[in-house]
């Protein structure tokens, strides 16, 4: 282990010296001088710059090409002006075009960024890391994003209120925008200096030109902006917006005989309120009471055979907006101290029922209210505080006699997140911290008899009066962290790190369940450094990461470092943690081809390596990966990669059993696509892997088809096929006398999915969108076996196959007579599965005035278990097209008051 670690360190640090000579190209910062309107009439936003106010400042031009041929004159020039008053910032653009008839005027929803567009970015904090982006297309479609991490993150969920108009003439096109200062954040000073950048996209040539040159080898985006001067005596505007909403919802479905909960339809009325209150210009308080997210698309279907939880992206507007402030990813991309999907999650406790019972269970926990205090001050303080309360959720159970009772399936819960960062050293350094807490009200009463029939309660139901909540859920959970980043040498080099700690408390049963969960698996039979302690009522763990590298300057980029997650680290109450008990070392190297040639516009090659260990010192995994990307001159592209995993050991494959060795694995992928600007474009790809001796194979085939027959209409169809074959897929654990048997089998799993989208933009404020996704996954098992030597190199030595005399079937289970004495030793259920699902959304969205919307939504869903003997396409016909779907119709109306 030590030898390999030294080799990897040498591999990384040798690159450091190799790359030191590459420096970022020095560029002079441009300055734009604006003027106030004062006694002039404010511009009317109509796409015609004919008001006298525009004569207060000259045009600024001299744009420079950024893509594809950086630092050359662009094909078409661009000019702009900026003026302001005490309430608004006004920007006028003149996008010259010698072939005005070829201007692309594609329509889309907000943030679609289709066709020709022009964009202004404002770093109002002048922190060289964050900014506000406003984009307007030639067709008049808005785009707006909040920029963070020096251009590495663009958050399209930020939707401020602003105004725009465009016109087209024989010399090009005009754009005019008006931005309320209340939608921007800046400090109070006599003269403001903001970072400024303007970018234009010439669609037909896929050319981008900029006002302030940003070299291709620059270490970021916002840090390279020019400056906006002349903003005198403008007062920060406190934002005050209140947005009430009302929702009606009708659910229809096939009625079930005898089930009073499923009579064919349900009708609901709901109302709530959202608000934005500017505490200062820098800091905003967001409030939501009884929020509704009926217009949000459902999550894509997925099946996890490895037992781990699946990470789903946040789509709910309240939690998406300003999420960058609360982001605290400390190890890999998913591990985070704050995973907002925990708030309003599906109930975690199952109501105890019999086969004759009917149930009515909530799909999600109700968010009673949430408050978010966030922003960034002129002095470099980033602040984020979030508080939310979800209600106590009850499931209703009805027995065969019609008696009803209620069971608590989710307790009243309070969630808190606090985040703080401070910039130093001319914004080249920051340090920060985070704290989270979760408190659950785990009361004693779980069962409520609605018919006052406690005296007739069966012994089975009486057992439910024990506090199942306390035995299943942790009562309190706390996490905290510190992080930092330092950049030097014009931000070309960096070092960053973080440290996290967690502490969870609960009953002995709840903490035992935590210890034995897939994240921890303290019950592993061969682990000497962890063990289940059923008397414990708390766990405390740590984690962290340290990375250093080169992010700009010349053609080379690299970084390397390590992270760790201790065995007792637990984040899943309000964060996301897939696996604890891991230490990882990593090294990455990239080479960027910065200058286009006759063959390509841009290209890159990357090599990376990482190794993992556990806290017992076991060397578990190593991977080498080579990646290449090329964007050809005609805007087609290819992405290719391959890698090798010569060492694969898993502490989780046997779900609490001993450490397991897998055969060496080699994988590859190839994707290529056509010019995405064309009316019809496509992407096709393949990725797959092969283990030694074909112990494991995986193949995935991907097609992405996009067609835009009209400027206002686009259609996409994205089918995908996955074929997974594994000779040792874990099935279950059974006892053979005093010996546990870890049973695996040969699985052949085929998964077919597709997504289908239609977007029709009637005008920039009125859109119709359809989304549909069929999903079918079928898994068949054979050649069942048990593990007898989990660390053997060859598969045949790792497992023992059951022979025909040892295994037989009974009903829907397998019966094992391992010692051939004619008696059943143990049995397990048939693990074959066929899951079928169809989801669709049809959404009509009308922004009837800026910030106020009407949504009409029609959602459909079909879920079921298919026939494992059917072919995939037959399951599509029988289980989806042949079933009556569940329908949901939603009307949601919002109105935004700006006070």
Question: Which residues fall in each region the model found?
Answer:
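Surface-exposed extracellular loop regions of Gram-negative outer-membrane beta-barrel proteins
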Residues: 235-286, 415-530, 595-597, 603-609, ...
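Short acidic, glycine/serine/threonine-rich loops at helix termini
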Residues: 208-210, 298-301, 395-399, 443-447, ...
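Exposed, low-structure sequence patches enriched in small/polar residues
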Residues: 366-368, 374, 490-899
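Short amphipathic alpha-helical segments with coiled-coil-like heptad repeat character
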Residues: 52-60, 185-187, 294-299, 306, ...
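Bacterial Sec-dependent N-terminal signal peptides
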Residues: 1-24
